[in-house]
Amino acid sequence: MESDTPILDDHLHLDPVNGKPREAVADFAQAGGTHLLVLNKPSWTLGVDVDRKEDFREGFDRTIEATETAKQVLPGRAWTVLGVHPGLISRLVDDRDFAVDGARELMEAGLDVAAEYVAEGRALALKSGRPHYPVSDEVRKASNQVLRHALSLAGELDCVLQLHTEDTDDLSEVGEWAAERGVSEERVVKHYASGPVSGATASVIARKDELRAAADSDEPFLMETDFLDDPDRPGAVLGPKTVPRRARWLREEGYGEAVERAHVETPARVYGIDLSVPSK
């Protein structure tokens, strides 16, 4: 991989409590990676049980700490994305006896806290979504309300919203909700996408079949590992070296234009971030 080619992992987790964030970022950089978006892990995986709005800050602050660790390896080339994992609603309702409306209100309050970090410049973007697994109609409705609240915040902040949703290539309804709140479809990013997505920008999991589908489409896309930094699941979902290695593979397969699209054009259009690589 050419040294002046930026390589972005659009969705990666670093765990300062249980994981080895510095080692993970070093592996990414050694493989040719240059830029990272670091997302907070679900609060419960960090040992944080949220009962009130302010409880979300502990997980957010730990994620910022992990991003600062990443910046020691990649100076100025790592950003934080904060929000509330959509699976929290099931944890609250099924395991902790919250009413659905109470769970929704707490999750919306957590997003309000995340929005404060974006407004202060401590985070680049928000994350939200809805469960990717079967839930009741009541939970699905509440989850969509949380998602729309996140879109409203993104519109107010003029920032990107990353989404964790069901496996789908059609988020056109979400794109309509976004437009109603002043958010363009391209600034709604579908995490763990398997190819192009209607109504959002695809952040494609860096597996070969999924990347071929994205590269062949001519649509804007990003690449991600969804790395968990979990010692009990080493390398899950994909290891930190994967995006730079897959970018190299795409070039070898004749998809050089797609690599530029995923790592230069789309990040600039969607996030407005500077992906220049300092000379060595």
What is the meaning of each model-derived region?
Residues 18, 106-193:
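Divalent metal-binding pocket/active-site signature
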Residues 21-23, 50-69, 101-115, 143-148, ...:
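Well-ordered, non-membrane alpha-helical segments in soluble/globular domains
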Residues 5-9, 35-37, 77-83, 123-127, ...:
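Structural preference for beta-strand elements that scaffold enzyme active sites
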Residues 6, 152, 244-280:
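Mid-to-C-terminal alpha-helical segments outside catalytic/metal-binding sites
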